[in-house]
A protein has these predicted regions:
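Boundary at the C-terminal end of the N-terminal hydrophobic targeting segment
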Residues: 33-35
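Local alpha-helix boundary/kink/capping signal
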Residues: 8-9, 297
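Sec-dependent N-terminal signal peptides
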Residues: 22-31
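Bacterial N-terminal signal peptides that target proteins for export
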Residues: 9-23
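Ala/Thr-enriched low-complexity intrinsically disordered regions
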Residues: 2-3, 30
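Metal-dependent phosphoester/phosphodiester hydrolase catalytic core
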Residues: 37-370, 377-381, 389-424
Length: 424
């Protein structure tokens, strides 16, 4: 009887030990295998782009590392920063985020998740922004990105090949409509894999919201009706409209065209104050999704200018940026290429007017544009996938180029003053 009891206990102990070993091996496998299951890695800024970088990564493991190891390229010693977890809508994806602070301006860094690296190819790289405009700064911008994964990869790779300091993408990223998590998985993978510069840098994102981030497209709630946008992306002001400042030389103002914040009211009041506070910034660009001066989608029997949101933008926002002057305005949503004439107070003004550039065709199918001469506000328009490349210089000039998805330049504007003349 005793022997049977001992054997039974021994068998139970062995089974328990085996179960513990299996669980331990599964845990190790999850930790070791998280990098193979990495869904996405993307960079953003929550504060000063010259001394900080926010690293975000998404995977499928609850036990993934929270640590980031980083160092200046060429240095031997690693620094470590520990991030935080965040939920991604109602999905099993696991998000982590860490903001690196105290970085040197205009400096290349290499980093990895969970450990240091032995070879540069094992990790990722980024570059901080310059504190002053002591070299030309270049960014790409557009919107309306994802139709097919193949086309998205091509468009992202094309944008990264221009070697931008960052990408300003304003709306309709994954076309998930606030519910389709599989679309976000593919979008995140594409950005991580394809949006890498020629020297191996991950391109930082400056993000705006569009109708396809929101359940219902417009007049959503915060953050309930845009759960992926608000969980994935953290902005300097923790909302879909905000300003990002680069020293004294550049400000980017990102707005929400009635997707989760109304155009009039609080947002319009904030815009007026933000522009007033930045009257001494050298360059100021404004970006948003739905256009004030579009190329399509007009109400039945009317022009794109007659769309309700277009009218609201011109009534509630345009007076503020005309009052203080801006470098240019970027619009999206209409799935075309467009450059307006210089416009001022809703009229053509080739001397003091503002350029409105768009119209959101990063990687989606394009639409029909008005016949030449039929839309008084348009200088040039066509159905063509593209990104805008912007280069600013310390002498106050900038070059803005339209680059199609095959890498061909097909339009260019030389802007000789940093900001338009303010309306008195």
């Amino acid at each position: 009887m005793t022997a049977r009891v001992v054997i039974s206990w021994k068998q139970s102990r062995d089974k328990l030990n085996l179960s513990m070993r299996i669980l331990f091996l599964l845990f190790l496998s999850a930790v070791a295998g998280w990098s193979q299951d990495l869904v996405g890695l993307y960079l953003m800024w929550q504060s000063d782009p010259s001394t900080t970088m926010t690293i975000n990564w998404v995977d499928l493991h609850t036990s993934s590392p929270l640590d980031v190891h980083y160092r200046r390229v060429g240095e031997a010693a690693w620094a470590k920063a520990t991030g935080v977890k965040f939920a991604i809508a109602d999905t099993t994806m696991q998000g982590r985020r860490v903001e690196l602070k105290g970085l040197l301006p205009d400096t290349h860094y290499e980093f990895n998740i969970g450990k240091g690296i032995e070879k540069p190819a094992e990790g990722w790289r980024f570059r901080t922004m310059p504190r002053d405009l002591n070299r030309p700064v270049r960014f790409v911008t557009g919107g309306d990105m994802f139709s097919t994964r193949l086309k998205l990869d091509k468009a992202n790779s094309n944008a990264a090949s221009l070697d931008p300091d960052f990408a300003l993408i304003v709306g309709d990223l994954a076309y998930a409509n606030g519910v389709a998590s599989n679309r976000w998985v593919e979008w995140l993978k594409s950005w991580m894999q394809a949006a890498v510069s020629p020297d191996g840098r991950v391109i930082p994102l400056v993000i705006g919201i569009g109708n396809h981030e929101v359940k219902g497209g417009y007049n959503g709630k915060i953050p309930d009706d845009a759960p992926f946008f608000y969980s994935l992306f953290t902005t300097p002001e923790r909302r879909a409209y905000y300003a990002l400042d680069f020293g004294d030389y550049l400000s980017i103002l990102v707005l929400d065209t009635a997707h989760t914040n109304p155009i009039p009211g609080a947002q319009a009041e904030w815009l007026a104050k933000a522009l007033a506070a930045r009257k001494n910034k050298q360059f100021v660009f404004v970006g948003y999704h739905y256009p004030a001066y579009g190329t399509t989608k007009g109400p039945k029997g009317k022009t794109p200018l007659d769309a309700a949101h277009s009218i609201e933008i011109r009534e509630h926002w345009m007076p503020s940026w005309e009052k203080y002057g801006v470098t240019a305005v970027f619009e999206n949503d209409h799935h075309n290429y467009k450059r307006t004439h210089r416009l001022r107070q809703h009229k053509r003004d080739d001397t003091n007017g503002i350029l409105y550039l768009g119209d959101g065709a990063w990687g989606v199918a394009t639409r029909t544009v008005p016949e030449p001469g039929t839309a008084w506000w348009l200088a040039k328009a066509e159905g063509r996938n593209h990104v805008w490349e912007v280069k600013i210089r310390n002498n106050g000039t900038s070059t803005i180029r339209a680059i199609d998805i095959d890498g061909k330049e097909f339009d260019k504007v030389e802007v000789l003053t940093p900001r338009t003349k303010p309306v008195e």
